[in-house]
Amino acid sequence: MPATKFSRRTLLTAGSALAVLPFLRALPVQAREPRETVDIKDYPADDGIASFKQAFADGQTVVVPPGWVCENINAAITIPAGKTLRVQGAVRGNGRGRFILQDGCQVVGEQGGSLHNVTLDVRGSDCVIKGVAMSGFGPVAQIFIGGKEPQVMRNLIIDDITVTHANYAILRQGFHNQMDGARITHSRFSDLQGDAIEWNVAIHDRDILISDHVIERINCTNGKINWGIGIGLAGSTYDNSYPEDQAVKNFVVANITGSDCRQLVHVENGKHFVIRNVKAKNITPGFSKNAGIDNATIAIYGCDNFVIDNIDMTNSAGMLIGYGVVKGKYLSIPQNFKLNAIRLDNRQVAYKLRGIQISSGNTPSFVAITNVRMTRATLELHNQPQHLFLRNINVMQTSAIGPALKMHFDLRKDVRGQFMARQDTLLSLANVHAINENGQSSVDIDRINHQTVNVEAVNFSLPKRGG
């Protein structure tokens, strides 16, 4: 048998064949790259946690198909950055389970897709939660936004969700990190023990929109304190100098329809915000009786530079705009705000409810109250801002309850008198009418000591200045 001859051509041919081998070995790896969509029902049903983790490793989008129920989701599942969970069936747990959303993650509900006792835990930027129905009293919150990492999260979208029979719906704990840009819109909240939306100690956040929501039947019966509010936003410690770094700020709450709760909108230590287009009914003390919260459609505590506009209330407690108080100590007073287009009709209520109760002060400061119409309710003004304007005010309160208009400016002998403006003070009243059920003037004004007083078209007399 002739000996094998190795020519240059033979070596080149062999070398070419060897060069191809790495690419041949790589082909199976390429075949395992994530697919665009995977179906969770193609994975073992007896271990949902492991199945979801593998599904997210295999696909860009994981689908829970219609009619399919994923049970026992009782631990944390991290959705890899940029991936999507599409829920058309149901995902259920015992309250300990959660999906952690990283940068660019989406959870989308379709065809009635739902989560029960499973939390969505937002930990990244550009996250979207949309269209999903959520319920269950297992977790404290259905959607949690926070964590303890000092990071900046941007551009959160929560839209068209339904949360019912739960504790909190959306809970933001903001002390450790920042949310720059959030849109929480077009959603429905009902039958909750806690708040529909709570934005707590969110002192670093900005550009927050909360709008177009329906909130119904929030009633805390579990003994928890400060639970049971529709929408609540809070800064940190009250401070009458209103430093930016301690306030929740730069937000809008708009187009809210609410009923059957103790308090609908609540802000503590806030500034630079707008609340507008709120329609409320049956905001009464019959709800959340032991939660320790005031009864009011809108409650504002220790806030600066805000606008409340176009509020329509029926058979409800109205507004409380009051001091920032901690353990009985008065730390701040509201300043620099405008109320406009406020309507309250309590003719069908058989008992006394708050009308509009305002405490305001400081120098410099202003308060403008315009276009108010209230029936069977009282407008109460306490303490003394530097400049106070009332325009187009019509209030009626029955004599058995009290006056329709109260103006108590004189707090010189009260600890709260520390907030009274005393220099360059102005009181301006135009087209202000306060009557009882018989159309008679109904006012209680303690003292006028403003340096400038302008009065036009009012149905009552002011007391003599000074004293």
UniProtKB/Swiss-Prot annotation:
Pathway: Slime biogenesis; slime polysaccharide biosynthesis. SUPFAM superfamilies: Pectin lyase-like. This is Colanic acid biosynthesis protein WcaM. Gene3D superfamilies: Single-stranded right-handed beta-helix, Pectin lyase-like. The keyword Amino-acid biosynthesis does not apply. It comes from the Bacteria. Keywords: Lipopolysaccharide biosynthesis. GO terms for biological process: lipopolysaccharide biosynthetic process; slime layer polysaccharide biosynthetic process.
